[in-house]
Amino acid sequence: MLLHVRRAIVDAAVDALGDLVTLGIVTAVKSGRQAPMPIATAPYLLVYGRQERSANLTIGGRARKLDRELILAVEIVTGEDDNDEEADAIAADVEFVIADDPTLGGLAKDLWLSGTTIDANAEGEIRIGRARLEFTVSYHTLATAPDIPKLDFTRARNSQYAAIL
């Protein structure tokens, strides 16, 4: 099964944010929307794609080139209170780590923080603090090769991908 570049981008962000576990800032970084562990283990991060927009870079044919923008969400779960200070401190660390490699290891052309939502909700009698940072991740693929990231279309004629161009 092919791995869509979108999935590879989420995985690369999870790997990069793993440094925050090593530093003791969060207890875990997981891909997906659902909390993978009891709230007592917070703070932790959930990383997932929220939506994606695509546009043609070229018109028609099998070799249609797509410009894609993925909204990558990094959700911070702070635990049994809705302490904005803790969420803001972790958000600053997340922003620093993600900005340190805006191509996510070469998968993306660029990425930037496009929005932050700070919230709290109740699960039973426990209030849980949350913040969601949304990063816009810009990348290119061929329409026929959504698993191959960031092709340099001007050099692809001399590469293994020449047959699909």
Regions found by a protein language model. Give the residues of each.
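Beta-strand-rich binding-surface signature
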Residues: 44
